[in-house]
Design a protein with these regions (language model features):
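Soluble non-transmembrane domains of integral membrane proteins
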Residues: 7-8, 12-243
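Positively charged, low-complexity/disordered segments
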Residues: 2-6
Length: 244
């Protein structure tokens, strides 16, 4: 694994580097959004290693950061042998006021990759929206309706039970998976100004009172599209219709 930088994650799968953060080509980002931007971590935040040393299937790691107002953010990251990450984002509000936060996860890809163009092979965004398969080519993503607020071509999916979204290539897939039987939003997005394609998971806004805490769990699969592995996640982890 090539490591963590701020809120960004880069992954090497055996001898294949699937995500790259050095030149900002392809990466995963986790965080919290809030109107009080100084009270949440950002891409330049320096996290402390609170627990663990090296991320392995047997040893998770926990990162921690405390905001100027005394809100503690933790991110626990674990991984299995087939490159399924479990991400637990925790907030402990030790400030004197209620805070409103919404957790998110983003897969970002700068510029469309070169695709094979074979008609029976889908390359682009793939997802699952409460029983409906989502498949978008890179051209489809750029053709989405423009959203003035986000300044991007955007499609939002309201999830009530099961959903996942990500990018699929010929042999590899990177996918954000929401916790089964939970409500959240997914988004496919294209920012023309920066030529960035995104697949997002957006969790509902939460109000966390002083002295209270919360935890959001999501999954990130970033590995080979091995049928037996994918079927195992579909059956044992309840990732609905994970075979794309």
């Amino acid at each position: 694994h090539c490591g963590l930088v701020g809120s960004e994650m880069c992954i090497r799968d055996r001898n294949i580097e699937l995500f790259q953060y050095e030149n900002e080509n392809y990466y995963a980002v986790y965080g919290w959004s809030s109107r009080d931007r100084e009270n949440v971590p950002n891409p330049n935040t320096v996290w402390n290693l609170a627990k663990g040393k090296t991320l392995t299937p047997n040893t998770p790691v926990t990162l921690q950061w405390t905001s100027p107002k005394g809100v503690i953010f933790e991110r626990e990251i674990s991984i299995d042998e087939d490159f399924l990450f479990t991400i637990k984002q925790r907030v402990f509000n030790q400030s004197n006021a209620t805070i409103d936060l919404a957790a998110y996860g983003i897969l970002a890809r700068h510029s469309a990759p070169e695709t094979i163009g074979f008609y029976i092979l889908h390359e682009g965004i793939v997802g699952y929206d409460d029983g409906e398969l989502v498949e978008l080519s890179y051209d489809d993503i750029t053709d989405q309706k423009y959203d003035d607020r986000e300044r991007a071509n955007l499609e939002i999916y309201e999830i009530t039970e099961n959903g996942w979204i990500g990018f699929t290539d010929k042999y590899w897939m990177s996918t954000l998976v929401g916790e089964p039987q939970s409500k959240f939003k997914m988004a496919s997005k294209y920012n023309e100004a920066n030529d960035i394609y995104q697949a997002d998971i957006r969790h509902p806004l939460q109000s966390i009172g002083s002295g209270q805490s919360t935890e959001i769990k999501t999954y990130l699969f970033a590995g080979a599209k091995e049928v037996n592995t994918i079927k195992t996640y579909q059956k044992e982890a309840d990732f609905a219709d994970f075979i794309d």
